[in-house]
């Protein structure tokens, strides 16, 4: 009996109880849920349905809970149903009824946990989108991990996900980048507002290697040469770093194309026709206050140049024209103001503001022995993606960055995350998977095979706890996807690995000595294979490897 099966049984039982006592069945909520109690002594599952219904139907919740418990006790698969507190019902499931969770996992394999809750949704997920003026910094690295995991997570729930990188190659930061390259090429000091680091020297030298006469060109041609080649080299490095990190994108959109293609002008024309644009002090303004922003925003500045929001407007309109019904933006901690701005832009263009979601990520710090780490010479004072991967590896870096809610600043302890110990969360989970793979190899050597015909033999409390946790995986994925919180998958995997290690320490899976393989061995091996599958599925969502040996 899965949690979903139990919830359906509870709803049907509650409807029958209400009918029997001439009470309003319409009071039942559309969705009934069961939860796992924090204290295992309180049962396998619990429900507060009687507390939800009592006031609505005019019955004391504890009395109503008693009626539910009596009816549930008579149902197939329910071992015990007891009333607790003011109206909770605690439930214990018969061992024979829990085996379906194992068979479901083994049947679904890599798709176990998937659902169709977002079937038909066309999602554009834009993340990282770092300026092409330097390597990916640690904040962008967090988005590279979290964004990729969120894309994988939404896909398991039926969404069609397009991962997109908005290439910010338009604006003053590109001018400063070009100035820095030219200064380096000429052997001059870095401009006051320029970019420093070994990477600037490297790129400047590569530009000269590709265009040996560049320093002899007229200034405008010289700048354009450094711009075109330098930006391309930097972006090539960024894409390679992200690829090596396990994060790839389906679409790369250039901000500059929004302006050169006329799409900014098209967006402004559409907004003008809608009455959302006005002119004041020689500038063109968008009435974002009409849609919840704290002030109207300049779209075209008084000098005739487009403000940054102009590109955002054109870019959002471009996404909608490509058929996306949900546009998720993942932005840095200094972009809180963009939430109202982007939603207002969507509303001004005639869309529901809820077609735009903005996730704001907080800062990441690296520490060693409790002290902040400054490690990048190549990027000046910035800690980069490449630095982090070099220090702790791709798997640990991704897991460490995904493991906490994005709205929480995090400190990554380099010694902890590079250690082969149970205190290292990614090692703890991966070791459980490797241990399960080793168990499967040993089982094959001993002639023990998986058999699901005798899962009713799995009556040990540690077996039950592990089975029920396997049953939680679909619900964890649904919740994590709906809340846009892939860190929930990390926490679940750590909890599941703990249940497995406790099961393994308490329940002998394979025969020893002259003992012949039996039905219990085969049933426990089936449980182990199901556990291995769920851990592998979870790690795949995170973009973290599931090693077979460690």
Swiss-Prot record:
UniProt entry keywords in alphabetical sequence: Aminoacyl-tRNA synthetase, ATP-binding, Cytoplasm, Ligase, Nucleotide-binding, Protein biosynthesis
InterPro entries the record matches: aa-tRNA-synth_I_CS, Arg-tRNA-ligase, Arg-tRNA-synth_N, Arg-tRNA-synth_N_sf, ArgRS_core, DALR_anticod-bd, Rossmann-like_a/b/a_fold, tRNAsynth_Ia_anticodon-bd
Signal sequence span per UniProt? none
Top-rank taxon: Bacteria
What positions does the record give for the motif labelled 'HIGH' region?
130-140
What does the record give as EC number?
Answer: 6.1.1.19
Q: Which family does it belong to?
A: Belongs to the class-I aminoacyl-tRNA synthetase family.
**Known NCBIfam families for this protein?**
argS
Q: What is this protein called?
A: Arginine--tRNA ligase
Q: Which organism is it from?
A: Mycolicibacterium smegmatis (strain ATCC 700084 / mc(2)155) (Mycobacterium smegmatis)
């Amino acid at each position: 009996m899965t949690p979903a099966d139990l919830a359906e049984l509870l709803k049907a039982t509650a409807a029958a109880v209400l009918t029997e006592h001439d009470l309003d069945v319409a009071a039942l909520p559309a969705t009934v849920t069961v939860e796992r109690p924090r204290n295992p002594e309180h049962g396998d599952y619990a429900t507060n349905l009687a507390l939800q219904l009592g006031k609505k139907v005019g019955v004391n919740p504890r009395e109503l809970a008693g009626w539910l418990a009596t009816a549930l006790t008579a149902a197939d698969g329910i071992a015990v149903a007891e009333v607790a507190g003011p109206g909770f019902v605690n439930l214990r499931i018969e061992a024979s009824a829990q085996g379906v969770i194992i068979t479901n996992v083994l049947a679904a394999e890599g798709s176990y946990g998937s659902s169709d809750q977002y079937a038909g949704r066309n999602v554009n997920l834009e993340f990282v989108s770092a300026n092409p003026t330097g390597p990916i910094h640690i904040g962008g690295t967090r988005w590279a991990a979290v964004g990729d995991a969120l894309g994988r997570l939404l896909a398991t729930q039926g969404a069609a996900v397009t991962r997109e990188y908005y290439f910010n190659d338009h604006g003053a930061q590109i001018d400063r980048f070009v100035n820095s390259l030219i200064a380096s090429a000429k052997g001059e000091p870095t401009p006051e507002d320029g970019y420093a680091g070994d990477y600037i020297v490297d790129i400047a030298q590569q530009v000269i290697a590709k265009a040996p006469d560049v320093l002899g060109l007229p200034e405008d041609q010289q700048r354009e040469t450094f711009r075109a080649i330098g930006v391309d080299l930097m972006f090539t490095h960024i894409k390679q770093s992200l690829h090596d990190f396990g994060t790839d994108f389906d679409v790369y959109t250039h901000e500059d194309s929004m302006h050169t293609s006329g799409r900014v002008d098209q967006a402004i024309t559409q907004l003008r026709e809608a009455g959302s644009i006005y002119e004041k002090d020689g500038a063109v303004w968008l009435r974002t206050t009409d849609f919840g922003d704290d002030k109207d925003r300049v779209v075209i500045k008084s000098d005739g140049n487009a403000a940054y929001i102009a590109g955002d407007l054109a870019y959002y309109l471009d996404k909608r024209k490509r058929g996306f019904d949900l546009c998720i933006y993942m932005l840095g901690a200094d972009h809180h103001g963009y939430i109202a701005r982007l939603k207002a832009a969507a509303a001004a263009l005639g869309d529901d503001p809820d077609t735009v979601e903005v996730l704001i990520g907080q800062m990441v710090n690296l520490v060693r022995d409790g002290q902040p780490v400054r490690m990048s010479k190549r990027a000046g004072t910035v800690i980069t993606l490449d630095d982090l991967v070099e220090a702790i590896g791709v798997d640990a870096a991704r897991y460490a960055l995904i493991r906490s809610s994005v709205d929480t600043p995090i400190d990554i302890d380099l010694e902890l995350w590079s250690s082969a110990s149970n205190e290292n969360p990614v090692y703890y989970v991966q070791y459980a998977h490797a241990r399960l793979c080793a168990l499967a190899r040993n089982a094959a050597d001993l002639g023990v095979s998986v058999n699901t015909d005798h899962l009713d033999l799995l009556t040990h409390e540690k077996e039950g706890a592990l089975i029920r946790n396997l049953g939680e995986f679909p619900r964890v994925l649904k919740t994590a996807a709906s809340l846009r919180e892939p860190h929930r998958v990390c926490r679940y995997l750590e909890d599941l690995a703990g249940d497995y290690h406790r099961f393994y320490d308490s329940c002998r899976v394979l025969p020893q000595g002259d003992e012949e393989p039996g039905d219990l061995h085969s049933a426990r091996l089936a449980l182990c294979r199901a556990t291995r599958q769920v851990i592998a599925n979870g790690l795949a969502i995170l973009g973290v490897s599931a090693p077979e040996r460690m």
